[in-house]
């Protein structure tokens, strides 16, 4: 009898979490787009502009071209993203951090907090080296993500990502928190695919397409031929 009760309890809990998982993964309830979406920053980035509280935004910088694209995106939407905002800046190389620090000086009203993330995988790394760095990144990123997510509670917030594989780890931790802690609400993860991806998505894009709340591409061909759930607003960077 006790075994039957325990089995029933496990089944109920498992069913509840499956339903919750379906609810937090936008892929299951987002319709495919067929036309160009309105290039409206509020709709594009899912921000509650009417809120009187400052926006809390997490931005992750990859390296090289990814950093350049992210900075141009922030600059193009500066009125929405950088107006009296609190920016949580994640980075994996010092050059990107310095580049952002130089850029953000123009917006003295923004508060910035820096978080260094290990790279999920180094270029030309062996399998063993990759496994080691991935485990280290998982642990370190979990600590950072938990701190940042709880700091955002009660305020309009956004996780803005593009580029490297570390974005996958960050997104997965956020979705796990949504799954286990429903009262936290949505993390509002927006992933912007690189301008260089015209016909096929990046490996990171292929993974995050199933996970993030909003997936944005910059070429119609990519949306129409490969990623029907994505949004296309034209060139953003």
From Swiss-Prot:
One of its GO terms (cellular component) is UDP-N-acetylglucosamine transferase complex. Residues 1-7 are lumenal. Its main location: endoplasmic reticulum. It comes from the Eukaryota. It is found in: Endoplasmic reticulum membrane; Nucleus membrane. Keywords: Endoplasmic reticulum, Membrane, Nucleus, Transmembrane, Transmembrane helix. InterPro entries: Oligosacch_biosynth_Alg14. One of its GO terms (molecular function) is protein-membrane adaptor activity. It is a single-pass membrane protein. It holds the Pfam family Alg14. Belongs to the ALG14 family. Present with 339 molecules/cell in log phase SD medium. Involved in protein N-glycosylation. Essential for the second step of the dolichol-linked oligosaccharide pathway. Anchors the catalytic subunit ALG13 to the ER. Heterodimer with ALG13 to form a functional enzyme. This is UDP-N-acetylglucosamine transferase subunit ALG14. The gene is ALG14.
């Amino acid at each position: 009898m006790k075994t039957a009760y325990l089995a029933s309890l496990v089944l109920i809990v498992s069913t509840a979490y499956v339903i919750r998982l379906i609810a937090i993964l936008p892929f299951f309830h987002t319709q495919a787009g067929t036309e160009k979406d309105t290039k409206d920053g509020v709709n594009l980035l899912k921000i509650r502009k009417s809120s009187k509280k400052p926006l809390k935004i997490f931005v992750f910088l990859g390296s090289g071209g990814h950093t350049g694209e992210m900075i141009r995106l922030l600059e193009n939407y500066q009125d929405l993203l950088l107006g009296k905002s609190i920016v949580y800046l994640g980075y994996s190389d010092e050059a990107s951090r310095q580049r952002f620090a130089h850029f953000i000086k123009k917006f003295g009203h923004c508060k910035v907090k820096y978080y260094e993330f290990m790279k999920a995988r180094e270029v030309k790394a062996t399998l063993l080296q990759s496994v080691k760095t991935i485990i280290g990144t998982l642990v370190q990123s979990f600590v950072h993500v938990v701190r940042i997510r709880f700091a955002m509670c009660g305020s309009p917030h956004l996780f803005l990502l593009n580029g490297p594989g570390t974005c996958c780890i960050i997104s997965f931790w956020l979705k796990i928190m949504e799954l286990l802690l429903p009262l936290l609400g949505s993390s509002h993860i927006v992933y912007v695919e690189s301008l260089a991806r015209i016909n096929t998505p990046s490996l990171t894009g292929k993974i995050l397409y199933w996970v993030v709340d909003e997936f944005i591409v910059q070429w119609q061909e990519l949306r129409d031929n490969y990623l029907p759930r994505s949004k296309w607003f034209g060139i953003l960077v």
